[in-house]
Amino acid sequence: MKEKSKNAAKTRREKENGEFYELAKLLPLPSAITSQLDKASIIRLTTSYLKMRAVFPEGLGDAWGQPSRTGPLDSVAKELGSHLLQTLDGFVFVVASDGKIMYISETASVHLGLSQVELTGNSIYEYIHPSDHDEMTAVLTAHPPLHHHLLQEYEIERSFFLRMKCVLAKRNAGLTCSGYKVIHCSGYLKIRQYMLDMSLYDSCYQIVGLVAVGQSLPPSAITEIKLHSNMFMFRASLDLKLIFLDSRVTELTGYEPQDLIEKTLYHHVHGCDTFHLRYAHHLLLVKGQVTTKYYRLLSKLGGWVWVQSYATVVHNSRSSRPHCIVSVNYVLTDVEYKELQLSLDQVSTSKSQESWRTTLSTSQETRKSAKPKNTKMKTKLRTNPYPPQQYSSFQMDKLECSQVGNWRTSPPTNAVAPPEQQLHSEASDLLYGPPYSLPFSYHYGHFPLDSHVFSSKKPGLPAKFGQPQGSPCEVARFFLSTLPASSECQWHCANSLVPSSSSPAKNLSEPSPVNAARHGLVPNYEAPSAAARRFCEDPAPPSFPSCGHYREEPALGPAKAPRQASRDAARLALARAPPECCAPPAPEPQAPAQLPFVLLNYHRVLARRGPLGSAAPGAPEAAGSLRPRHPGPVAASAPGAPRPHYLGASVIITNGR
């Protein structure tokens, strides 16, 4: 009996083992693996396989007991599936509602160091960090659906991070905690719904399982990752305040690294994506590594780019405490919606760009307009038709100027004048003209200035007023420019550069004629047609520059001929008078506060006794002889009288004087 019982037990064990071996052969595993399985492993793997067939009835081949119908497409599908697992940077796993791992691919050994046989059929809670148990339970729990579905099965997307046990070396595994590695799991929760009593609202659902793909995050050492053209790296503190940025960020977002340093990453993220970034930041601080969702990083000039970041917490090698955050960022798109400005930084940047462009264009225009205004008014040098006589009374009395029209405009341009005289600013306190090449027998300098003239100027004048750069012609120009305009006496010159307007009297009555004359603010003079006017004096030759007095009047009739004769007699008397420039100098007369406007003739300004004060010394009688008289017709046209020569400077030379 004992032998029979021993033999029966042995036979039973052998049959049992044989059945287990036969069952192991039915498992979709290589024979090398199934031949070494124990009974517990075979039962565990078989149970998991049966659950998988319930979840994917059509994905695991034909049912037992049915003839296999293999075709060419089936063999291709099997080969394709094996290739997909090899190319997948991760592993596939299926977890039941109770946490049992129904299936996991053999590629899990590459990332975790754990074999497929060891993991299949066991609870996933045994291989994840204790702090992640609650999260895993929440993932496997389906809340009542918000909308009733007519479909019997539907799926709910899931994306989460787990710290799974890893037995690989820490150097190659990229471990963040002792023995655990962060795995990014993304997939869906499959739910099956059942109808009760054919009522849509009386239904229940069953959680079939979680299907997900686990992916390892990039290692924390940035030297182990090759940065491509669409990637950049930054290092930040634990509160995401940027400390260092790669130079590639300029090409991808427009920001310079110094523009983002010491600023938090939240400041440059689209407002709708800050919640996702905050959630990823929380997971990063808790689990040590995270992969963000796609979020929008604002561009410098407007719009945004889509970015996904792989961040890791770096620990201090000595204290093992969290030190900083290193993130590798993938820019997935070009700048979108460049015209949208969603932050104050973008607005200020665009304004600075516009102001920079405006400043650049303005500076270019200013550089072009900074050329002297007088260069536009340059005229050809006019040759003197009369040979110069050194130190003669003719040249001292002539008062030659380079441009007639500049009596009431800016000082004329001289070929030998220094640049500082040509390029005086509008706010300058200097009021002088360039020196003229006249052979004066004495040193000439700037004209004396009265206090009432520069009442609105600065009290102290520059030292340049003491330099010998003026001329007697400037004395008359200065005093005559400061006199108020009068409707009875106007200035007229026979030059195209004379200030002009449709109403000359209106131009001469400006509130500040000195400033208008200094800066050339008065428009050019346009003389009337020759048929409608004539000059009081015969004009000088076109090539002769003069400072003569001209006044436009209508054509003279017979009644006005005596008046012209009186003017000729006055000129003759002036020519016989001694030159004013040779007279001894006298103290400058003090001009009253308000002076009437006088004629432009220089000899009348300094010689005649009139509104300017006392007459010029040395010619008291000549001043009285300047008053116009009406000589008879015989005296005006005597045949033996010397024929006078008229010059534009109102100086008459008779018999070669």
From Swiss-Prot:
Domain PAC intervals: 218-288
One Pfam family matching this protein: bHLH_HIF1A
Protein name: Single-minded homolog 2
Localization, UniProt: Nucleus
PANTHER family in the cross-refs: HYPOXIA-INDUCIBLE FACTOR 1 ALPHA, SINGLE-MINDED HOMOLOG 2
CDD domains per UniProt: PAS (cd00130)
Source lineage: Eukaryota, Metazoa, Chordata, Craniata, Vertebrata
General function of this protein: Transcription factor that may be a master gene of CNS development in cooperation with Arnt. It may have pleiotropic effects in the tissues expressed during development.
Compositionally skewed regions (Basic residues) per UniProt: 369-381
Tissue expression profile of the protein: Transcripts were detected in high levels in kidney followed by skeletal muscle and lung. Low levels were found in testis, brain and heart. In early fetal development it is found in CNS, developing kidney, tongue epithelium and cartilage primordia.
Keywords: Developmental protein, Differentiation, DNA-binding, Neurogenesis, Nucleus, Repeat, Transcription, Transcription regulation
Stretches assigned to coiled coil: none
Annotated Polar residues bias: 354-364
